[in-house]
């Protein structure tokens, strides 16, 4: 019998990381944790190390590494604790690693995800910002290295399942008319427009269907999450923005659809549980038990659809514009959004200010070509600086 596949889980203490480790634990004959990384939830990371006994753990700073190393050694765990961004890249690209779950949220996850790609790993991509920021560079690296890139976002995983195996030959060539990217509409889908300025972080984080981290929950509430996913879909499936249509589907049962030229629409359905796309990507092209309950269509009862209202969700409009503009625009969109969402979560700005800040950054910063990672990161820094200036002027 072959040895278990070794997986590095980047962002192990987040919701995606925990779901990944749940699947790992269900299949000890198939998978084992090689490295687990965490950022701020270090007590949770220690507990995960005690349970999964990885070869490596990675934390942000040396002091935290020394403390965690001591705790694990006292418990008889031989995990070696590393620290810093370079260590993240090392555990993502180590020769012993078979697959990498890239689940660090935001721009911080880009270098390690790219390191896994350049090392030719099977990369389970949950960090959508990596593709949003550096789409062309990222996909070129995939082709150059021979990495296997499998999407973890439920929507992109659904699209991947609904496309033919040879979709890389070109969407038109395989008969695809358009990709239908579904969205729940978040907690504010029916909130009166005049009330959106006064919603709280707690309300924004109360997603009706999915359990997610705070930043992604706010992105879902503003539908920036769907805007980032639109950009990601364009890169993953070599689609034009005009070929990707966003559809609000409140039940979150249909995770996305592919519309073909013969009139067929193929969809992937399932309960809203990230273990489904995670297990599919881990085992692809096979399928394995994930722990997700079967979908009860009789309990679902009905499936509703509606067009997104761009007045209610201006972030979706801004993301589509950035996708159409290209160059550094998506990286700046993402950076401005990260700054704005953090400020909202800290109660420095209103929910409605998030889109205002992003639009201000996109209007003030010139779009440039991005031909290297340094240029991507420079665009990211410029956008963060401009967004910070807005906060100083209006929220200081």
Swiss-Prot record:
It catalyses: 2-C-methyl-D-erythritol 4-phosphate + NADP(+) = 1-deoxy-D-xylulose 5-phosphate + NADPH + H(+). Its EC number is 1.1.1.267. NADPH binds at residues 13-16, 127, 129, 213. GO terms for biological process: isopentenyl diphosphate biosynthetic process, methylerythritol 4-phosphate pathway involved in terpenoid biosynthetic process. It is an enzyme of class 1 (oxidoreductase). Mn(2+) binds at residues 153, 155, 229. Catalyzes the NADPH-dependent rearrangement and reduction of 1-deoxy-D-xylulose-5-phosphate (DXP) to 2-C-methyl-D-erythritol 4-phosphate (MEP). This is 1-deoxy-D-xylulose 5-phosphate reductoisomerase. InterPro entries: DXP_reductoisomerase, DXP_reductoisomerase_C, DXP_reductoisomerase_N, DXPR_C, DXPR_C_sf, NAD(P)-bd_dom_sf. PANTHER family: 1-DEOXY-D-XYLULOSE 5-PHOSPHATE REDUCTOISOMERASE (PTHR30525), 1-DEOXY-D-XYLULOSE 5-PHOSPHATE REDUCTOISOMERASE, CHLOROPLASTIC (PTHR30525:SF0). It comes from Pseudomonas paraeruginosa (strain DSM 24068 / PA7). Transmembrane segments: none annotated. The gene is dxr. Its cofactor is Mg(2+); Mn(2+).
